[in-house]
C-alpha cells in the first residue's frame, strides 16, 4: 500500500504549472511540420473509426490501438500519478501504464464517439515551451464547432502527443485529479487501482 501525503497541495502545484512539468524520458525538439503530420495521421484514423458504423466495443478497441500508436502513454501515466510515482516499484509503474492505457483509450474513445456524423479538421500549429501545439476544430451535427488542441513532443524517438485540450479542458490536469481521487477511494492501494482501472 502506498501512503498519500499532501495530495491536495500536490494537485495544486500541478495546476499552477499548467501541466508543463512532465516527468520521464528526455525530450528532443519536434518540428511543427512533424507534429502536424502526426496529428493529421491521428485525426484521419479517428475520423475513419467514427465513420465506420462499428459497435461501441469495436470502436473502443480501435481507439486503444490509436492511443498505442499516437500517444506517449508512459509519460501521461507517470504524470497523472503525481508523487505516488516515486513510491511505486518498476513493476507497479509498468502495470499501471498498461492499465491506464486501456482506461484512457476507452474514456476518450467514448468522447470521440460523440463525433459520429461529424469530423475533426486540423487548422494550425504553434511552438510551445515544451513541444508543439496542433490546433483542430471538431465539426459536429447539431452543435457549434469547438476547438481540440493536441500537444506533441519527441521523447521516444518519434512525435507523440502527450496532452489533449478539448473545449478548454486540459487532459493532463483533469486526469491527475481523477486518478488521485480514485486512488484515495481505494485507500491508497495502487495495486487495487491497477486491477480495477481498466473496468472503470
Predicted regions and their residues:
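Surface-exposed, polar/charged faces of alpha-helical domains
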Residues: 55, 90-91, 117, 188, ...
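Early exported N-terminus immediately downstream of N-terminal targeting peptides
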Residues: 32-108
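Boundary at the C-terminal end of the N-terminal hydrophobic targeting segment
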Residues: 27-31
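Short beta-strand edge/turn micro-motifs at domain boundaries
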Residues: 145-147, 151-173
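N-terminal secretory signal peptides and thylakoid transit peptides that target proteins
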Residues: 1-18
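Low-complexity, intrinsically disordered terminal/linker segments enriched in charged
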Residues: 166-200
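Surface-exposed, charged secondary-structure patches
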Residues: 106-146, 196, 200
Amino acid at each position: 500500500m502506498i501512503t498519500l501525503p499532501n495530495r491536495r497541495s500536490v494537485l495544486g502545484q500541478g495546476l499552477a504549472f499548467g501541466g508543463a512539468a512532465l516527468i520521464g524520458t528526455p525530450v528532443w525538439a519536434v518540428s511543427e511540420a512533424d507534429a502536424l503530420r502526426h496529428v493529421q495521421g491521428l485525426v484521419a484514423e479517428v475520423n475513419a473509426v467514427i465513420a465506420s458504423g462499428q459497435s461501441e466495443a469495436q470502436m473502443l478497441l480501435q481507439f486503444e490501438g490509436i492511443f498505442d500508436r499516437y500517444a506517449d502513454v508512459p509519460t501521461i501515466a507517470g504524470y497523472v500519478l503525481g508523487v505516488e510515482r516515486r513510491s511505486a516499484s518498476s513493476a507497479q509503474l509498468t502495470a499501471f501504464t498498461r492499465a491506464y492505457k486501456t482506461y484512457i483509450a476507452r474514456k476518450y474513445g467514448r468522447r470521440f464517439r460523440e463525433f459520429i456524423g461529424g469530423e475533426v479538421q486540423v487548422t494550425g500549429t504553434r511552438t510551445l515551451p515544451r513541444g508543439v501545439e496542433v490546433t483542430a476544430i471538431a465539426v459536429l451535427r447539431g452543435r457549434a464547432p469547438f476547438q481540440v488542441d493536441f500537444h506533441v513532443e519527441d521523447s521516444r524517438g518519434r512525435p507523440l502527443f502527450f496532452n489533449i485540450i478539448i473545449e478548454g479542458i486540459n487532459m493532463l490536469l483533469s486526469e491527475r485529479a481523477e486518478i488521485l481521487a480514485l486512488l484515495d477511494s481505494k485507500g491508497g492501494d495502487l495495486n487495487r487501482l491497477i486491477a480495477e482501472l481498466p473496468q472503470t
